[in-house]
UniProtKB/Swiss-Prot annotation:
Name of protein: tRNA N6-adenosine threonylcarbamoyltransferase
NCBIfam families: gcp_kae1, T6A_TsaD_YgjD
GO CC annotation terms, alphabetical: cytoplasm
Main location: cytoplasm
Organism encoding this protein: Cereibacter sphaeroides (strain ATCC 17029 / ATH 2.4.9) (Rhodobacter sphaeroides)
Signal sequence interval, chain numbering: none
Cofactor(s) annotated in UniProt: Fe(2+)
InterPro entries reported in the protein's UniProt record: ATPase_NBD, Gcp-like_dom, KAE1/TsaD, TsaD
Annotated residues for binding of Fe cation: H118, H122, D316
A Pfam cross-reference name: TsaD
Gene name per UniProt: tsaD
GO-annotated molecular function: iron ion binding; N(6)-L-threonylcarbamoyladenine synthase activity
Annotated cofactor note: Binds 1 Fe(2+) ion per subunit.
Catalyses which reaction(s): L-threonylcarbamoyladenylate + adenosine(37) in tRNA = N(6)-L-threonylcarbamoyladenosine(37) in tRNA + AMP + H(+)
Gene Ontology biological process: tRNA threonylcarbamoyladenosine modification
Length: 364
């Protein structure tokens, strides 16, 4: 059995400043502390995350979060075995703030420095919480990303498909903005949809008529915009029932797309011949109740185990970064002072870029 390791994790890739301490012994892990300082109030007036504001907030808060995480864990820097930090992908200003702090701590203490792919942090969370064995199928669904991955190792992922445009979380945020709901959009739309009729509006289920596991959500967002504008033109505004029905219809369409694409991904994953096949979901959108329920049903029908992290570990956090750093460190991964912040960092570097990735290639 590998020796116990205690790592500090640092996360600053979007609008959550976070630090955590995780101790691992073999396949067992314990989160000794997890501090998340969100920036929702800073960005609320803008209807979305403003990169410059986010970067400044990270620079102001990161050292305080690290101090709190160590204090809550009852440890000092001398008690750690390493420092893990999100090195990408993400908003470059925030990622850079985290990387520079981690470098300074590593240089000052002599501790190993491990750069972590933010998405690997999400994808490896089921191993932190449940000790899930490789290989497993992962649906990574968040504000900026959506892809199906077969996780074979701490740094070995095979992408089966992903969104060619908007990620579901981004679509939820834009839907909330279009309907005048507060950010972040995911919880707001889900709460509003609870009292709505999902059948009132015939929203599309994009790309279900095409084979494979790729997805698209920008057309769904456009359909909602047109439905909203039609109601405004007809009535002069939206009632509470209109908003609830629009949210319910939008959410039902997202659920249907994710459920059907998951069925297809499970068919590809079956060829892996895993001894204990499992489907896991991670990322901020994994906190959505109807999405979890639909994926649970899909997994049960396929006869595979379904795992979803606790809600506090679905959204961005540093515990997953500390754990992913431990996993990478155990596999021989370690970085020096040349570690750089990366706005783009695909998990499966051998996979072709998805349509819509742009000239610079895949972001993740």
């Amino acid at each position: 059995m590998s020796r116990p390791l205690t790592f500090l994790g640092i996360e600053s890739s979007c609008d959550d400043t976070a630090a955590a301490v995780v101790r691992a012994e073999g396949t067992r892990a314990e989160i000794l502390s997890s501090v998340v300082d969100g920036q929702t109030a800073l960005h609320a007036a803008f209807g979305g995350v403003v990169p410059e504001i986010a970067a400044r907030a990270h620079a102001e808060r990161l050292d305080l979060c690290v101090e709190r995480a160590l204090e809550e864990a009852g440890l000092g820097l001398r008690d750690l075995d390493g420092i893990a930090v999100t090195a990408g992908p993400g908003l470059i200003g925030g990622v850079l703030s985290g990387v520079m702090l981690a470098k300074g701590l590593a240089a000052g203490t002599g501790l190993p420095l491990v750069g972590v792919n933010h998405l690997a942090g999400h994808a490896l969370t089921p191993r932190l919480t449940d000790g899930l064995a490789f290989p497993y199928l992962m649906l990574l669904v968040s504000g900026g990303h959506c892809q199906f991955l077969i996780a074979r190792g701490a740094e070995e992922f095979s992408r089966l498909g992903g969104s060619i445009d908007d990620a579901p979380g981004e679509a939820f945020d834009k839907t909330a903005k279009l309907l005048g709901l507060p950010q972040p959009g995911g919880p707001s739309v889900e709460a509003e949809a609870a009292s709505g009729d999902p059948r009132r509006f015939a929203f599309p289920r994009p790309m279900l008529d095409r084979p494979g596991c790729d997805m698209s959500f920008s057309g769904l967002k456009t359909a909602l915009l047109r439905a909203r504008d039609g109601l405004v033109a007809e009535k002069g505004g939206l009632t509470r029932a209109d908003r609830a029905d629009l949210c319910a219809g939008f959410q039902a369409a997202v659920v249907d797309v994710l459920a059907e694409k998951t069925r297809r991904a499970l068919a590809f994953y079956a060829a892996e011949g895993a001894a204990r096949p499992a489907l896991a979901v991670a990322g901020g959108v994994a906190a959505n109740g109807p999405i979890r329920a639909a994926l649970t049903s899909v997994a049960e029908a396929a006869g595979v185990r379904f795992l979803a992290p606790p809600l506090r570990l679905c959204t961005d956090n540093a515990a997953m970064i500390a754990w992913a750093g431990i996993e990478r460190f155990r596999a021989g991964g370690r970085d020096g002072m040349e570690l750089s912040a990366r706005p783009r960092w695909p998990l499966d570097r051998s996979a072709p870029a998805l349509i819509g990735s742009g000239r610079k290639g895949a972001k993740a």
